[in-house]
Amino acid sequence: LLIQHLKPGVIDLRLVLEGYKPRQLKITVIQGQTAEASVTLEKSQGVVFGQAWENGIQMHFAPLGKDLMISIWETRVSDYALFVKESGHIAPRPAFFAQTPDHPVVNVSRDDAVAFCDWLTTRERKAERIAQSHAYRLPTDLEWSLMAGLEEEEGISPGWRDAHKQKVYPWGTDWPDGEKVGNFADMSADGIPGVLSDRTIAGYDDGFPYTAPVGSFLPNNLGLFDLSGNVQEWVEDEYLKFGIHALGVLRGGGWNTYQTENLYTGSRNAVPPTYQDSIYGFRVVLAKVPPKSE
């Protein structure tokens, strides 16, 4: 590291490198001379963008490009329970079906999901697992599409993208024929409370009538699980750029989804961001925060 144009005197330096613990250093600069220093940095458990990583609460992340890390799972019951315990945030109402800690949390609004991200950012910065220039948040609508392998037009609303969605699923173009590709309203859900018999996928059995443990089905090529089914996932955007009433966006379908058009990768569910439901959950991303312009 070469630093030029320093004024003579004692200089305090803070060395920061992804994947290593920060190090404080003092050097003395003398007019007309070169000051040299040798420093050994200690490896940390902090994030290195571009590499698979596990954070401080055992959430696993996979890279998407150079500046974004994606949680490979939907946020779990255990993750959210820790958030409630440490922050005092109001706990979601219990699901009307049994869930274990490794199931996706449900009955959370977009506002709840944002609060979780803010808490996790503060927690991980304090533990020096992420830098002050990193933050957890919900994925944008466009980022979610990229996560699921779908390239869509930038600069337009999720509502426009929804109206012009392609007839493709995260696993391909064919409707599942016996192969377990996700947790939907299947034969195991036929007739259970909350699912009508005529609102299931005939001939398909994923083995889970309600939510499934995260990661129960095969991941996509990025190593991400459950991008179709299990729970619908909140994203950051509003459904329309203009409108009197704000509508949030949910992606991916859920355990009660049975209609083909609602399982297309480009399908969106537009609901008020304060709504909570037993099919609503979320996953988080870790992003580099752009520097503020002067």
What kind of feature is each model-predicted range?
Residues P22-Q24, A35:
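Extracellular and select intracellular beta-sandwich modules with Ser/Thr-enriched
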Residues S278-K292:
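Short, structured beta-strand segments at or near domain termini in extracellular proteins/domains
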Residues T28, N269-Q276:
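Short proline/glycine-enriched turn/loop segments at secondary-structure junctions
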Residues L1-K7, L25-K26:
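Short, solvent-exposed S/T- and G/P-enriched segments that are highly enriched in secreted/extracellular
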Residues K7-P8, D12, L17-E18, E36, ...:
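A short glycine-rich, aromatic-capped structural motif
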Residues L2, S71, P101-P104, A135, ...:
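Residues marking the start of alpha-helices
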Residues I27-G32, T40-E42:
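Short beta-strand edge segments in extracellular beta-sheet folds
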Residues Q99, R110-R268, S278:
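Functional-site microenvironments in short loops/helix caps that host divalent-cation chemistry
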